[in-house]
Regions:
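Chalcogenol-based redox active-site neighborhoods
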Residues: 1-160
Length: 160
C-alpha cells in the first residue's frame, strides 16, 4: 500500500552523481524544512520518460518556484551515473535534481514498486509526491502506461 497524504517520508538514502563522485543523500535530512516535488519514472532513457515526463518538469521548472517549491527531483530505479547522463541528455541538470534509488528502497517504502517484466525488472511506478518539511502533502500514482496526474502540469495545478 502506498504512503498517503499526511505521512512522513521514509528515512532512506538515495544517490546523486556529482562531477567527482557519487554522493549519498538521506531523504529526510535532504528534505529538511523545504517543500519538494519528486517524481518517479520507470526508467531513464525510456520513451515516455525521456520524451514527455522529465522534459515537462524541465520546461515548467520556473513555475514551481512561483508555487513555493524549493526543489524538484526526478528519481528512478537506476544508478547515479545513468541518472546524471540522462539528465545531461534531456537538459535537466541545473534545474531538476537527478536521484538514483538503485535498489528500489524508497520505491518499496512508498509502496510504488511494480514488476516491469524481464527487460526492466522491479521498478517504481510512474508517480509524483509533494512533501513539505518531510510530510507528504500530495501524491499521484499512475496506472500502467499512463501519464496524467504525475505530469508537471498536473502537479502545478494541484499546488494551486
Amino acid at each position: 500500500m502506498a504512503l498517503t497524504v499526511g505521512k512522513k517520508l521514509p528515512n532512506v538514502s538515495l544517490h546523486t552523481k556529482t562531477e567527482d563522485s557519487v554522493e549519498e543523500i538521506n531523504l529526510l535530512d535532504w528534505c529538511g524544512e523545504r517543500r519538494i516535488v519528486f517524481f518517479y519514472v520507470p526508467g531513464a532513457f525510456t520513451q515516455t520518460c525521456t520524451n514527455t515526463h522529465l522534459p515537462g518538469f524541465v520546461r515548467l521548472f520556473d513555475s514551481f518556484a512561483k508555487k513555493s517549491v524549493d526543489v524538484v527531483a526526478c528519481i528512478s530505479v537506476n544508478d547515479a551515473h545513468v541518472m546524471k547522463a540522462w539528465g545531461e541528455q534531456v537538459g535537466a541538470l541545473g534545474k531538476i535534481v537527478m536521484l538514483a534509488d538503485s535498489h528500489a528502497q524508497l520505491a518499496q517504502a512508498l509502496g510504488v514498486t511494480r514488476d516491469f517484466g524481464p527487460v526492466l525488472g522491479e521498478r517504481a511506478k510512474r508517480c509524483c509526491f509533494v512533501a513539505d518539511k518531510g510530510i507528504i502533502i500530495h501524491s499521484f500514482i499512475e496506472e500502467p502506461g499512463q501519464l496524467t496526474g504525475s505530469s508537471a502540469e498536473a502537479i502545478l495545478e494541484a499546488l494551486q
